[in-house]
Amino acid sequence: MIPGEYILSSESLTGNVGREAKTIEIINTGDRPVQIGSHFHFAEVNPSISFDRSEGYGFRLDIPSGTAVRLEPGDARTVNLVAIGGDRIVAGFRDLVDGPLEDLKVNVWEGREDDWRRSSAAGDAPQELPQVEAAERGRKLDEATDVGTEDTPEEGQN
C-alpha cells in the first residue's frame, strides 16, 4: 500500500437502507438562492422554502453526506427525505427543536413562522435575539479583542 492511497470497492454502496423515507415537493419563495445541506433537519430549513413543515420533522435530505441541494428563487423541486438516525437528537440548526425528536413533536409546527420559536429541551433557548446598535457591537468587539493587553503593574509594584 502506498501512503495516502485509496483502495475502493468495485461494488456500489446503498445508503440509508431500512430507514423511513418520503418524497415531498418544495419551492423557494424567496428572492435569494438557498442551499440545504445533507444532514440539516429538514423541518428547520430556511423559511423561504415552502412546504408542509410537519412532513420534514425528523427527516433530512436523502443525498450523499457533505452535499447539498440548491434552489434558486422560484425553483420548485421534488426531494427525497430520509429519517434522521442515531439517537435522533436534533441540536442547533434554527433552534426550533433542540432535543430528542420523539419527545418534542406536539404541534410544534402549527401556526405562523413566529410561533415556532420555543424553549429548548433544557429550557434555555432564547426567545428573541437582542438587537444591538452597530456602535455598541463595535465597542463590545473592541473590549473582547483587548483581553490581556491592559496595563498591569510591574512585578513588585502596587
UniProtKB/Swiss-Prot annotation:
Keyword hit for Repressor: no
Main location, first listed in the record: cytoplasm
Location within or outside the cell: Cytoplasm
Catalysed reactions, as listed in the record: urea + 2 H2O + H(+) = hydrogencarbonate + 2 NH4(+)
GO biological process, alphabetically ordered: urea catabolic process
Pathway entry: Nitrogen metabolism; urea degradation; CO(2) and NH(3) from urea (urease route): step 1/1
Short name of one Pfam family: Urease_beta
Record field: compositional bias (Acidic residues): 144-158
Annotated segments matching region Disordered: 113-158
Subunit structure: Heterotrimer of UreA (gamma), UreB (beta) and UreC (alpha) subunits. Three heterotrimers associate to form the active enzyme.
Family per similarity comment: Belongs to the urease beta subunit family.
Name used for this protein in its record: Urease subunit beta
Gene: ureB
